[in-house]
Structures are given as structure tokens and as C-alpha cells.
Amino acid sequence: TAFMITSVFSLGCSYFETYQMQQIRAMGTTADVAITSLSEEQYEELSRSSLVSVVGVSQRLGSIDTSGMDDALLSITWIDETEWQEHRVPTISDIHGDYPQAKNEIMLPTWALRAMGIDDPQIGMNISLSYQLGTDYQYISDEFVLSGYYTDYSASRAGNRGAAYVSELFATQTGLPFDSVSTAMI
């Protein structure tokens, strides 16, 4: 009887943990709240607040021209170290390489690489992309270096929508105002 009760509780706990992980992966973040159009002052206030345990920043800088990639939609996004480590890494797997550091580095989910025709990605390989920044709909063609790639589970929920991660240096050099592109992830 004790064995049976222990087995039922073990199975129940394992099922709950697995279900919870599936939900987190489908959402693509462990954050509970997103505050859009965040000002730098609001970010500082949230960071100092004892009511908030973790505040990450996500900046949607623009989008990639995905016209040759079926129905995929990719944003160009920069996230800070806190957002990456605390909110995003727990929701992805099979991480190869590192988060971008140099201006021309990019990190992509494997489903996006496959949509680009890249089935065997290599760290350091060049990837040519056209993208637009902010509300300027003029596309820029540029060459990026793949700094990393990973398995993303949220694309199936979001219908092949995802992010191409870029470096803080890239984000800074866009000149886009902080409050027009920033979201606090809590």
C-alpha cells in the first residue's frame, strides 16, 4: 500500500512538472508580466523595487524580411543578460554557441535556420539578411555571423513567429529611443 501511494504521488508530481515545463516552453518566457513602452526611469524604478524579484529588458528593434521563408515572421530583438538567463534560457534547449556580443553577430532558433535552408548550422558562418528597423520600412541588407542557435518551442504556439537575437552594440547603434522599443519582462 505504501509503495502504491508513493508511486501515485511520484507519477502525479512528475506529470505536473512536465506539464509546467511544456507550458513555459510554449510561452517562450518565464516572465509573468510584460510592460511595453518602458521608459528608462520606469526600468530603474522596477529594478530598485523590493516587490519585483527579476526584471529583464527586451527591445524589439525591427523585423527581418522573411518573404522566402514560408509563413515565418522574425523580429530583430535585443535582450539584456537578466532577460536571457532568467526568462529565456529556461524555455529553450540545445543551445549551441553564445548570445551575440559583436555588432554583426546573430543568434537564431533552429526552425528559422531551417526555413532559410540551413540544415547544418555552424557557429561563425555568415548569414545574409534583409531587415528594417523601427518604423522605417526601408530594408537594409547586411551580413551577420552566427554566434549561436537553439531549439525554440514557442514557434509552434505562435505560428512560426520568433526572434533573431542581436547584440547590445547593434541595439545601441540603431539609435532607436529606449522607450519606443523596450519592454520590461517581470
Map each language-model feature to its residues.
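Basic-flanked hydrophobic alpha-helices used for secretion and membrane insertion
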Residues: 7, 12-186
